[in-house]
Amino acid sequence: MNDHPSLFRIYLQLMKLRVVVLLQITAICAILAHDLMVRGDAISGDRTWLETLEACLVTLLGGTLAAGGSNAINMVYDRDIDPGMSRTRARPIPNGWISVRHSLIFGVTISVLGSAVFALYHWKAVFWSMFSVLFYVFIYTIWLKRRTCLLYTSPSPRDLSTSRMPSSA
């Protein structure tokens, strides 16, 4: 029996698609809420339903790639702590299914591609997509995540251990 998943499945795991789906639901709801307010004359604008659909599709593609790429970069950075947690020890890098270099190249590439997709729509969307990727990688992953327990989330209370909290906690 081969427990080693295909490269495609490894890429999907690196992207943390379950988390990305939640982000995308929020994004699509925001687009729809905006356009419904426009149609109700609560705010100004004149986008058609076809343009709304286009905005949703661009957001789904670009947002999934950008967020998925930043998640892959996060896994590269967390490769030293992932083997020690039950929730993360089965990830592709700790299992040796993919190299750190390959994972980083994948993450950076799809982050840039995701942000580039927004160029089809508006330069401001490109800016905010890249800002989000950089914020997640540098501010959350590298700077904040290991410095405070207030950012720690876990699906199970048993995963919350004092070893993950700063000594001042």
Model-inferred region functions:
Residues 33, 120-121, 142-143:
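Helix-loop junctions at the membrane-solvent interface of multi-pass transporters
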